[in-house]
Amino acid sequence: NLQEGDEVMVTGPAGKRFLLPEEPERHDYLLLATGTGIAPFRGMIKELLEAPTPSKSDIHLVMGVPYTTDLLYDDFFRELASSFPNFHYHTVVSREIQPDGEPGGYIHHYLDRQIHLHEDLLSRDRTLVYMCGLAGMQLGVFKMMAERGLGDAYLKVKPDYAEVAPAEWDSHSIRKYVRPTHRCMLEVY
């Protein structure tokens, strides 16, 4: 039963990697979220776009959910996308038909199908990738990047695993043999 004026002990922030860089304007961003993994991106995007001088960085947010009713902050992100030409909001709904008529899928399916929208972004030296949400997203995105030849900037594969085809990777093996580089930040659970 705390009373006004009582002292409390707090800690944090606990993370050291899942933050915007010190000079955010020097980077472009691919932000990948599933479910409640959207929460840190809302804060990052607000910091980038609602600053006195909004960021000119290219920012792509891909939000994956089972149903459209699960799209957290959807109106907020759609409004930002209509107000800032450098902010792009993409939704992936796994258990419904997509707006383009494609079947539902996961974030890695979307990125693979729409690679023409993201290949240039992923090929830039200034791009950072952030993933927050379900751990299954990490496996799918890592495999897609490696299969598309985009993984070198974002993934470090241990030498004794380099000959294994990405299609054969599984969640156990990526934890053991595949690490994100300094350009790929993960917060998966």
Describe each region flagged by the PLM.
Residues 1-30, 44-47, 94-95, 173-174, ...:
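FAD-binding FR-type
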Residues 11, 49-56:
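Secondary-structure boundary elements
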Residues 20, 41-43, 140-143:
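Short glycine-/acidic-enriched loop or helix-start segments at secondary-structure transitions
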Residues 22-25, 53, 122-123:
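Short, flexible hinge/linker loops that cap or flank conserved catalytic cores
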Residues 30-33, 131:
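Catalytic cysteine-centered active loop of the rhodanese-like fold, especially the PTP/DSP P-loop
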Residues 34-40:
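Ser/Thr-glycine-rich phosphate-binding loops at phosphate-binding pockets of nucleotides
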Residues 40-52:
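Histidine-anchored nucleotide/phosphate-binding helix
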Residues 60-189:
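Reductase modules of NAD(P)H-dependent flavoproteins
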